Amino acid sequence: MCIRDRVLGILYELDGEPCPVDPRHVLRRVVSRLADDGLYPVVALELEFYLLDSALADAGEAHPPVLPDTGRPAERTQVYSLADLDGVSSFLAEMESVCAAQRVPLGGASSEYAAGQFEINLEHVGDPIAAADHAILLQRAVKGIARKHGVAATFMAKPYPDSAGNGLHTHVSILDDSGRNIFDDGSEQGSDRLRQAIAGTLALLPESMAIFAPNANSYRRLIPGNYAPLAPNWGYNHRDVSLRIPVSGHKNRRLEHRVAG
């Protein structure tokens, strides 16, 4: 019996210094600087993906699959369809089991805005590095389990020219030393520090696009009518902006970064 495991490593130079191109070190420095100011991010990620016909995917062609549990082609565009979730119920059940074994905190799953498109949400965690690790492990699990169930999976930003793209949505709130959410001041609009965080994030957005949209396909996603951002903007519960402030209770006030894909 072949036993396999995985290790998420951190890169160091031969002299023991952190490797400058390791993104975990970059994120660790950011988290450390926030902690020096008594601030602690709480992060949750949402990942969108398509399930595809595996034979055509192997040939380099994207085409919706036959849903493995119902035998019905994934043809409809019905956001939040329960029937589409029924069609992949065994896939989702195995996802839950595999992620539990890896301590990846799944939150929920939904069918999305195109045929064969789904989203899986991860729970909020107080360690941004762990949140990033969870996303990587989730991607690997989705692709591997999809193959086991006779379909392929892709997180490509825009696999179909005329359908919605896939994004990575990052939800962030920040707590102070007392555990209070600094984005909440009891008002419906949120605190001044929330608006300051929005302003700073938008100011850095042009330079950040090399990471958030790293290839030409990423920009094919950024078109009108697909719940993807078109400008460095923000809004309350608006799904076409770069930074969305979701409807939530005051203590859960957060910023959703919707650009990456």
Region annotations inferred by a language model:
Residues 4-261:
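Glycine-rich, acidic/polar active-site loops that bind/position phosphate-bearing ligands
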